[in-house]
Amino acid sequence: MKTNKLLAVLLLLLPFAALQTEASRKKTTVWEKPVTMYANTGTIEVTRVEFADTATLLYMHAEHTPKEWIRIAAESRLTDADGKTYRLTSADGIVPGKRFVMPDNGETDFTLRFAPMPKGTKMMDFAEGEAKDDWRIFGIHDDSYSPEIGLPKELKEKKYEGDETLPVTRYAPGKVKVRFKAYGYRPEMEAKVYGWYSVLGEKQQRRFAVKLNDDGTAEVEAELTHPSVIVAGIRNVNYASIFAVPGEEVSLALDLANGQKDDAFFGFTGSLAHTNKVINGNVSRLQRLFMSSYDSLMTTGTDGWSAAEYAALISKTLKEKKEAVNSFKGLTDAARAILRMNLESTALGWQYDFSRSWEQAKIRRANIKTAAEYEELRKSLNVPHFDAPLTDVTPMELLESDYAMFGNGLSSAYSYSTPVVINNAYNRQVATVEAFLKGRISLDAAAEATITDPALSSLVAGKRAKDKQLQEELARRGNVFFHKLDDVKPADILATILDKYKGKAVVVDIWATWCGPCKAGHKRMKPLKEDLKNEDVVFVYITGPTSPAETWLEMIGGIDGDHYYLTREQYGHILDTYESQGIPTYLVFDREGRLTFKNIGMVANDKMKEEIEKALEWL
């Protein structure tokens, strides 16, 4: 009887409890899709905000290197538009002030609980700690809210009239001034305009980082060698691709309140302003016109497919995408040409990467579980290799048009040992000169005679003069071998190097100037070298033309050992011989020149010392 009465009471209370729950829910204001105006970090982001009576909750997502740690300072705070601060009170999923080690997938979620803010709050800032370099996220607001940041209506709604075509492109160096304005910017953001652009013949892109003025403006000066692309923007917000011509001035503006949307950039000026607007203003819509991953296409293919069948798939995909570009409404002729050349560049890249993608597709379908299984399968695969494109890929705008340099794709002509044929005489000269400047090819007298354009010819002469000066300087260094072994056949190059050190153990470090792990390895090995300085061991460093000679020369001054700068073919042969899929690659040879140890990637000093000591033992 008592049980029945208790049940009756509970049933009567249920509606009341439901009402209480509903009332509590209504007291909580939620931003389901918070956006930010600027963050000085890409490691953490706010995914949801809740305003309750007792607390303001920020739901956070973090991405960082697996097994490395992050930390949220106990002093973290929120600040509203009036400057009032709300301190961190507790957290779930992370302990404030303590190191949190990232899981194997490099991602984690946690919740930060702050003192309650007014539920009518429209925008807030987050500061993780008090130090200058601690994480900061500015202008957090709900996606439905549009902050007033003083956007000039006439600029935001600027009309771009008329069509535009790409200019005839020639090597004609000149400066481009880029005027940048970020609306919604505040001095405390301390942001910079970052960007990059390519220069004919230079192996690495030129980069810039210019601090924004207090009013959100900045000026960047780029030295272009021909009409081409300058990428500029604010890190963790957005980047614009600006198509510019040497000698002109261009401008653009960024709406930080909508920084990650298609219409974030506006107010373009310059000879291709309309083209810049339609490309940067339609990024999401244009995504479907891009080529998808070639690796994915190959993975879905049949094991029995031939190279010709894969090539046919590439051609079919390229044709379909080009047709989609040509029918896409609202683009200028210049924008269509740029998009078509981008597709052609991707198609050439797919052909160039055929062997790698073919191998990776086979490995994916094999469902490899361990490193041993991976190595075993790799040895059993008969990977096809090509010294020329799978099919005749010409004619292409990327190679044959009078604006081909704009797409910066002529360098792809020498991606193969058998170059892609270019019929346009000027473009052929550009491709040859660029390949020479980047160290991909050498120029004999007959080849140099084909360079008839005076400006391009002067580039060749300048490179030869610089190389001569460099060689004279390096000749005075007994431990540096810059192109001194060019006449040695690739198959004999490593034996020729090792013969010099018979009777000693040799550690070979295959590296490049642009390789971060390689440079880290050089620093890490300094104590090891000091420890072994009285032993019969030599450290040999090998690189090739992917490393700019001037940069290489500067860097090797701080690396004890013998340094070899080889030809592309010699360098590639060593990597192929020792099945190196990456750098740094470390090889240890004993006193008789026999390989005793190989490792791709970082090696602990203790392990390396152990292997060197084994190599030093006389058999």
Map each language-model feature to its residues.
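Short, well-ordered beta-strand segments enriched in hydrophobic/aromatic residues
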Residues: 55-64
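Short, solvent-exposed, Trp/other aromatic-anchored flexible loops in extracytoplasmic proteins
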Residues: 89-124, 128-131
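A non-transmembrane, solvent-exposed segment enriched in polar/low-complexity residues
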Residues: 139-334
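Oxidative protein folding and maturation machinery
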Residues: 168, 173, 246, 256-504
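Conserved helix-turn-beta segment immediately C-terminal to the redox Cys motif
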Residues: 504-505, 522-543, 614-616
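Conserved redox-active cysteine motifs that mediate thiol-disulfide chemistry
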Residues: 510-527
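Conserved segment of the thioredoxin-like fold in thiol-based oxidoreductases
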Residues: 530-571, 580-583
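Thiol/disulfide oxidoreductase modules built on the thioredoxin-like
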Residues: 569-613
